[in-house]
Amino acid sequence: MNIFEQTICDWTAKVLNNIDDSRTWDTSSFNELVEKPPNPDMGDYALPCFSFAKSLRRPPFQIAVELAEQLQSYISPETPLISIQAKDSYLNFTVSAAVMAEVVLPDVFCGKYFTEPSNISRERVMIEFSQPNTHKGFHVGHMRNVALGDSLCRIFCYNGYDVVGANYIGDVGAHIAKCLWFYSNYNTETPPEKFRGEWLGELYTHAVKKLDEAEGQEKIKFQKEISQIQQKLEAKDEQFIQEWEKTREWSLLDFQEIYEWLDVSFDHIFYESEVDEEGRQIVIEGEKKGIFQYSEGAIGIDLEEEELGFFMLLKSDGNTLYSTKDLALAQHKFDQFGVKRSIYVVGAEQTLHFKQVFATLKRMGYEQVDKCFHLPYALVILSEGKMSSRAGNVILFSQLRKEIIESIQSNHLGEHRQEWSKKELEETAQKIAVAAIKYGMLNQDSNKQIVFSMDDWLVSEGDTGTYLVYAYVRIRSICRQISREVVADVDFSLLAHPNEKKLLRQMLDFNRTVFKSGEQYRPSLLARMLYEFSKDFSRAYNTCSVKHAETEMLQAARLLLFHCVAETLLQGLHLIGISPPERM
């Protein structure tokens, strides 16, 4: 809560206690009620009066008028609030721009504003995200999960949580048996030098196609061969384990290169192969204890009481399922890492699965399950429809990277080819590319489907990551053009233009927005705030010139303002996983 919100709550509590003796009104009664008006012309803050109606026994709009009249007496030249008005059932408060600037700019300038939230000690949180499968290509559809999880890790860390970013790589399963079956029996190609994991994904697609097209005895033969490979892998047959380890490493090297390019890291990586047998033993022991039951030779748990049906945990042939391994994985998270909150960033199609997993963990006695949360997200599709590794209609990472870098170097950096070094051109193109991809994956709520369009996402105007980094670079360029040093000791009262005040208000709201983005699992809130912030800067740039300011004092004040806008934008971009270049 900032000084203005605190003042609103303190004054309102005093007035309510004067007019209502039926209870004691405390500041904490409505510190969560203070909000931002839908229209900035209405004021800087709003307080709805609906929750006061029951106690005061009169309509909210009447309460708003009465409170506004009494609150006027608190306003003076020394107070941060300069206007209080009743509008319908709301109280609208206007803040002094000079006081707002004096409060926020020095703290942003010295960096204190961005360190205060992380001083709050909160619980340990594990955020599990990405979860790619080896022996399959990493494609553009995987980027949404990566962008969501990485941003949440950064946001939770900023908000003071002890964050463990985790990956859970699918390195066992039927898809691997199919891939190795085709690789061993039908492949005639030499593995490429780079992105061999993607190449394995192509073999997997060929395997699926060959299996789907087979009929009769041939299909039975193929299925039997694949089943035998699966059994040999589970039995740790030396020949197939060596093939599995070699090809698995190809995929892991692909993933490592992709994460480095995207500037994404993990504190811990789990592998399905590591929890496979452990999950089996958990289920067997659970059956002995009466937690789980046999059903037609398989083992599962009856979740009818939770209206979640029968949840199978172990197949009748003894083979494990995703559910088997998820129980072992959760146990590791709780026992080995001591997490108090566990977040799973996984596609919306797994919603029922996670409801069943969490219900099963609760039956097993894990109280932490109440703080387990599945963050579902909708698909990323192409303009022609849904992507599928099985069908092979995906944009693979290597193709995406090549095409997006070529487009950026041609359309955005072409004029710098003669003057910039090759290294700077490549690094700048990579930063713009990552900004375009990550912002495109984050600027909508996770339940909204995304249509991927590289051309649209690379436009330097409008709601794109490219626009955001352009705004940042532009601000830095403006500040470099001014020969004077940026200082915090300025006349804050000179920052009186409405467009300057909008920027101040956005900076003042920054930490609140970041906190809400974490608690609501919605990085989209921060992404959209950064877009609005960048638009507000463009308006201020056109109306509040730094270079052509009327006086040196005004130039110093605006230079500080624009410098702080750049610092806030930089911090916000970092929290959604974007590192902007310093020039473009």
Where are these regions (language model features)?
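Non-catalytic interaction-recognition regions
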Residues: 1-101, 110, 116-584
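Beta-lactamase-like hydrolase cores
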Residues: 105-106
